[in-house]
Swiss-Prot record:
Organism listed in the record: Enterobacter sp. (strain 638)
Predominant localisation class: cytoplasm
Cofactor names: Mg(2+)
Sites where the protein binds Mg(2+): 486, 492
A UniProt-annotated Pfam family: RNase_PH_C
Mitochondrion in keyword set: no
A GO BP entry: mRNA catabolic process
The protein's name in its UniProt record: Polyribonucleotide nucleotidyltransferase
Database matches in PANTHER family: POLYRIBONUCLEOTIDE NUCLEOTIDYLTRANSFERASE, POLYRIBONUCLEOTIDE NUCLEOTIDYLTRANSFERASE 1, MITOCHONDRIAL
Length: 711
């Protein structure tokens, strides 16, 4: 019999329901979590046995959105969901980052978490629901998971923090921050902001962590009622004698190797030391496992770096704790791109370009929460050569998607509004060298490239990555961390912003016990580093260029009456297609009558504007137009007078004498002056060549009526 166990609780303005025991009973654990009609089904499966030769923790987190959740059928030929979207990939990373550090070191059994969105309320984002579900399922599973964790979204509206704001509230919010943590400590922060202060950002983190305690309490209560027995897993006993033997052979040599400042040279020396140590020990005892020896050597490396930092000694590359690596900033490095920059910080380098396009180039995104259009695109590429390796080159991986989104968040707050700068902007960051914080180098490079492209960004932005080494109550915050310091440290803390405030904050913490005080020190130290980098960047370019690149399309905007849109588009788009071909421009029309003409040539744009004005101009009775004969009939001729408008010249209005045959006076395609006599209620236009000719020949004007009377 199905026997569901349910917990309900109020979480801010939402009601959260946790339900287990009803579905997926063959999985290690399964939970259905709902928050006001947004429901996510999360399963966990853990393998009891490890794979032979396994030396890492194979945790996989999959997040998948089903279109039926929003009452939709998927697009595409197959009409079913395909590979994960960028949004799904980012949420999978959001779930993974806070749960991964809560598994004990040495646990290498395969674990898979699958979160499936099965119902969605357009006002409630499924990401927080999925994170709560993953925490609950892992806690119920009996796996050696040191959770549960809670998660919360924090907004900032009217100078007040808002817990789990709705999608509509987020549009008014100056902050979109997601925080996750255990009962005692914050583990992860992901955010974008409209240039808020360090204190405001820290306040949001603390607020979110305090509010999510109710989630942790309810998951604990659910585990008491429905949790599976804890796995009887113990880490392998430490071989103290072997550890001492490895340390005797390698500790001093590894410590010296970490004084080599050049990354490639240092890595080469470390590889030699490790290989020689393992070879020596295996020669002494063939039963020793090379993987086990590698793990011991890694622990010695980690301890060597950390102990030196805590002792106040210089870092791996000789810097003090708050020093920034040498900077080299260049703009306009690529001649035919719309904007470009090369940003180098030590051994990290990014070649960043900015490209301007029209609204037609914007990305249309079909999401579960609703369709939207994105006119600011940010793509981050991390080729293997950037770290001196070979590897596969192809579609972006999870890490590249995540880093690209973080860099985009760093720049988004300073981008101009669409009505002031109606371009689609694409920024691409090519990481050409990497030794720590390439995503923050991308933020700096993007700011420079956008200014070089003439994009009127509100301020320059820069990013910096901070690190932490902590033992007991002793801690040191490091500015501008290297790759090794990231890998061997306890925290990766990335901050982007302008001189005014923070635009993006990302934090991943590998240990418990990160206090508000430590975060405050890190934020203040990051501010000093950010201002230093901005100072160097401003020496290269301190304001957007006065004009966009000569190779970029120039967008000219005019306004027409919405009633005239159909005239410019024409039947089946015939008029606008002809206009595009005739003028060599790109023309886009919005529902409110805004017309955007994009052209790399100013004369072509002026021509297109003139043609549109002709098409949309109201026909004035009594005005003389230059027309072209389009059709000849027995009773007269039809003449086009521009703007797709046509009128009839009756046979009696062709000349000031009797006309027997229209073709005696007019030919197809002939250009003639015509005067508008009348526009009737149905929009039909009566024209006269006779009266137009009389008005354009003043000398003959008095005689023509007299001659006509004489006849």
């Amino acid at each position: 019999m199905l026997n569901p166990i349910v917990r309900k609780f109020q979480y801010g303005q939402h009601t959260v329901t946790l339900e287990t025991g009803m579905m997926a009973r063959q999985a290690t654990a399964a939970v259905m979590v709902s928050m006001d009609d947004t429901a996510v089904f999360v399963t966990v499966v853990g393998q009891k046995k490890t794979k032979p030769g396994q030396d890492f923790f194979p945790l996989t987190v999959n997040y998948q959105e089903r279109t039926y959740a929003a009452g939709k059928i998927p697009g595409g030929f197959f009409r079913r969901e395909g590979r994960p979207s960028e949004g799904e990939t980012l949420i999978a990373r959001l779930i993974d980052r806070p749960v991964r550090p809560l598994f004990p070191e040495g646990f290498i059994n395969e674990v898979q978490v699958i979160a499936t969105v099965v119902s969605v309320n357009p006002q409630v984002n499924p990401d927080i629901v999925a994170m709560i579900g993953a925490s609950a399922a892992l806690s119920l599973s009996g796996l050696p998971f040191n959770g549960p964790i809670g998660s919360a979204r924090v907004g900032y509206i009217n100078d007040q923090y808002v817990l789990n704001p709705t999608q509509d509230e987020l549009k008014e919010s100056k902050l979109d921050l997601v925080v996750a943590g255990t009962e005692a400590a914050v583990l992860m922060v992901e955010s974008e902001a409209e240039l808020l202060s360090e204190d405001q950002m820290l306040g949001a983190v603390v607020f979110g962590h305090e509010q999510q305690q109710i989630v942790i309490e309810n998951i604990k209560d659910l585990v008491k009622e429905a949790g599976k027995p804890r796995w009887d897993w113990q880490p392998e006993a430490v071989n103290e004698a072997l550890n001492a033997r490895v340390a005797a052979l390698a500790e001093a040599r590894l410590s010296d190797a970490y004084r080599i400042t050049d990354k490639q040279e240092r890595y080469a020396q470390i590889d030699v030391i490790k290989s020689e140590t393992i070879a020596t020990l295996v020669a002494e005892d063939e039963s020793l496992d090379a993987n086990e020896l590698s793990e011991i050597l890694h622990a010695i490396e980690k301890n060597a770096v950390r102990s030196r930092v805590l002792a106040g000694e210089p870092r791996i590359d000789g810097r003090e704790k708050d020093m920034i690596r040498g900077l080299d900033v260049r703009t306009g490095v690529l001649p035919r791109t719309h904007g470009s920059a090369l940003f180098t910080r030590g051994e990290t380098q990014a070649l960043v370009t900015a490209t301007l396009g029209t609204a037609r180039d914007a990305q249309n995104i079909d999401e579960l929460m609703g369709d939207r259009t994105d006119s600011f695109l940010f793509h981050y590429n991390f080729p293997p050569y950037s770290v001196g390796e070979t590897g596969m080159v192809g579609s972006p991986k999870r890490r590249e998607i995540g880093h690209g989104r973080l860099a985009k968040r760093g720049v988004l707050a300073v981008m101009p509004e669409a009505d002031k700068f109606p371009y689609t902007v694409r920024v691409v960051s090519e990481i050409t060298e990497s030794n720590g914080s390439s995503s923050m180098a991308s933020v700096c490079g993007a700011s420079l490239a956008l200014m070089d492209a003439g994009v009127p960004i509100k301020a320059a932005v820069a990013g910096i990555a901070m690190g932490l080494v902590k033992e007991g109550d002793n801690f040191v915050v490091l500015s501008d961390i290297l790759g090794d310091e990231d890998h061997l440290g306890d925290m990766d803390f990335k901050v982007a912003g302008s001189r005014e405030g923070i635009s993006a904050l990302q934090m991943d913490i590998k240990i418990e016990g990160i206090t508000k005080e430590i975060m405050q020190v890190a934020l203040n130290q990051a501010k000093g580093a950010r201002l230093h980098i901005l100072g160097v960047m401003e020496q290269a370019i301190n304001a957007p260029r006065g004009d966009i690149s000569q190779f970029a399309p120039r967008i000219h905007t005019i306004k027409i009456s919405p009633d005239k849109i159909k005239d410019v588009i024409g039947k089946g788009g015939s008029v606008i297609r002809a206009l595009t071909e005739e003028t060599g421009t790109t023309i886009e029309i919005e529902d409110d009558g805004t017309v955007k003409i994009a052209a790399t040539d100013g004369e072509k744009a002026k021509f297109a504007i003139r043609r549109i004005e002709e098409i949309t101009a109201e026909i004035e009775v009594g005005r003389i137009y230059n027309g072209k004969v389009t059709r000849i009939v027995d009773f007269g001729a039809f003449v086009a007078i521009g703007g797709g408008k046509e009128g009839l010249v009756h046979i009696s209005q062709i000349a000031d004498k009797r006309v027997e045959k229209v073709t005696d006076y007019l030919q197809m395609g002939q250009e003639v002056p015509v005067k508008v006599l009348e526009v009737d209620r149905q929009g039909r236009v009566r024209l006269s060549i006779k009266e137009a000719t009389e008005q354009t020949q003043p000398a003959a004007a008095p005689e023509a009526p007299a001659a006509e009377q004489g006849e």
